[in-house]
């Protein structure tokens, strides 16, 4: 959703508008009992480290694709965050599947595909870390960036929007931040939201509206924040950068309202969907961007993440960070492989005992993740 011209991008405005979206919801509801079930399973599931082996599968899940110096790694994080959306394609039958490509001789499935393309560009001398290069990007640059080596084609969708995002990053970085993302962090000074409108989430929404504009849901800004928190913990940044990444108001985090989280939630029964939405998902039909169907499952996903984090107890921010990883991975790595009657030996899953699609409504197992042609998630 694009913000209105009168948007202030304050946290208070965001909470009010998110509440209004939930009040208007008609296609999706939340199941409190199933929320308690999932909240009781998620911490132990995540603690097993089950996600880690998928670094070595075609998903390459969570595996860094290139190692760079500190400032370059931050710059790449911005570029990657502006492109990590619409990561699916249609197969030869018209059914939706995760984006699948061969990059530098390796097969990739899902979100790691885009990261592999960014790394390939850098290794081949296309300096996507330079704001001037980004500002001058052409359609040929985008097509070369996302070309599948196995087919010679470009399976990534909405190339015009991807080109616009590359160019916006470059021009705004040059105009406002001396070409460097670290200066965005310096202006935010360790806050997601500030009274003067210069918090990190606010800067992304306000100054990069093509790349990050999605108000009040702010999926890409929030997912970018989660990735920066993980990046900070995975390496030893200089003191200044480390301080800038220690956001002081993490209580203002929200879960990412994308398509994988609601897919897991509807499969397991955290979300209850009506027949109209279920029919579209079973038929792999597009949902109109900005429609009530889209707004309903996205707003409900944010509320579900809040309730799950509270139900887990303890540190709310730590719970939300765990859920952000667990729910996305569960959908891509497990739900995608699941079917009615699959054995625990073939696909271990701690949520199977409470899974609505498995035990109550088998039609939910036919549902694909929500399909929207959008650059917001």
Briefly describe each language-model feature range.
Residues 1-218, 229, 233, 272, ...:
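Phosphate/adenylate-binding glycine loop and adjacent helical scaffold
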Residues 165, 217-220, 257-260, 318:
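Residue-level detector of well-ordered alpha-helical segments, enriched
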Residues 174, 226-233, 265-273, 306-309, ...:
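Hydrophobic/aromatic-lined pockets within catalytic cores
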Residues 202-208, 249-257:
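Short charge-dense sequence patches
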Residues 213, 217, 253-257, 293, ...:
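Secondary-structure capping and boundary motifs in well-ordered enzyme cores
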Residues 221, 225:
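Alpha-helical phosphate/pyrophosphate-handling elements in metalloenzyme active cores
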Residues 231-253, 270-280:
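Short acidic alpha-helical/loop segments enriched in Asp/Glu that coordinate divalent cations
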Residues 247, 258-263, 267-268, 278-377:
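C-terminal structured domains
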């Amino acid at each position: 959703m694009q913000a209105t011209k009168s948007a202030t991008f304050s946290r208070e405005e965001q909470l009010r508008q998110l509440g209004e979206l939930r009040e208007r919801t008609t296609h999706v509801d939340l199941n409190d009992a199933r929320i308690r079930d999932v909240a009781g399973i998620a911490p132990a599931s995540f603690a097993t480290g089950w996600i880690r082996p998928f670094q070595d599968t075609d998903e390459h899940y969570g595996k860094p694709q290139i190692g760079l110096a500190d400032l370059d790694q931050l710059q790449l994080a911005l570029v990657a965050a502006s492109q990590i959306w619409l990561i699916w394609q249609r197969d030869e039958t018209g059914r939706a599947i995760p984006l699948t490509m061969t990059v530098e001789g390796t097969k990739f499935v899902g979100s790691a595909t885009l990261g592999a393309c960014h790394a390939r560009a850098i290794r081949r001398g296309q300096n996507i870390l330079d704001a001037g290069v980004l500002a001058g990007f052409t359609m040929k640059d985008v097509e070369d960036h996302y070309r599948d080596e196995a087919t010679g084609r470009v399976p990534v969708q909405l190339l015009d929007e991807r080109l616009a995002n590359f160019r916006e990053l470059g021009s705004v970085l040059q105009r406002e931040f001396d070409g460097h993302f670290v200066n965005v962090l310096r202006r935010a000074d360790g806050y997601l939201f500030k009274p003067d409108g210069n918090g990190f989430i606010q800067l992304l929404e306000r100054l990069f509206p093509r790349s990050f504009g999605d108000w009040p849901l702010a999926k890409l800004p929030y997912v970018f924040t989660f990735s920066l928190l993980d990046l900070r913990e995975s390496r030893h940044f200089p003191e200044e950068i480390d301080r800038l990444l220690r956001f002081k108001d993490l209580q203002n985090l929200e879960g990412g309202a994308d398509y994988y989280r609601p897919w897991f939630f509807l499969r397991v029964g955290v979300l209850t969907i009506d027949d109209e939405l279920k029919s579209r998902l079973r038929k792999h039909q597009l949902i109109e961007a900005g429609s009530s169907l889209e707004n309903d499952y996205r707003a409900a996903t944010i509320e579900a993440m809040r309730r799950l984090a509270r139900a887990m107890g303890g540190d709310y921010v730590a719970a939300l960070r765990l859920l952000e990883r667990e729910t996305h991975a569960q959908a891509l790595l497990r739900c995608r492989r699941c079917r009615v009657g699959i054995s625990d030996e073939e696909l271990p899953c701690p949520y199977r005992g409470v899974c609505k699609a498995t035990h109550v409504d088998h039609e939910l197992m036919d549902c694909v993740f929500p399909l929207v042609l959008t650059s917001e998630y």
